[in-house]
Amino acid sequence: MKLNSYHALNQQMISHTCGNGLKICVFPKAGFKRAYAMLAVNYGSIDISFTHDGELYTSPLGVAHFLEHKVFEQPDGGNALQTFAKTGASPNAFTSKTMTAYHFSGTEKFMKNLEILLDFVMSPYFTDENVRKEQGIIGQEIGMVNDRPSWRVYENLMSAL
């Protein structure tokens, strides 16, 4: 374990890298009632090619965002949002250009909520039916984003770089 101090921010970070490469960072906050946890992976909207065991794989555009939505689904027909609600936690997720992150905050049952987070992200549930359903939802989101002029300007600027 490693302890980093950020004196200008009056903050410390405890970090550890597990044998499987998972990096864990803890930011202790004395006096805080609410706890937060985030699991982030280096797979975002621009990541369409990757190498595994020496073999190159390419995925279609939008897979990271699609997976962000999909992993919330559970085999019992429910979803992780409902499971978190039972513990009083507030979950969410986002996909950026370079990562996908799942997170929650809550005032109690931190370890139970962390278990829920790790379980639904690390053991996703896919069926042909729920994949088809999600494809339609993602299509609607793309349409909504494309209706925002500020987003289109941003995307055009980024593509010009």
Predicted feature locations:
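His/Glu-rich zincin catalytic helix
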Residues: 1-79
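Acidic/histidine-enriched segments that form metal/cofactor-coordinating
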Residues: 75-161
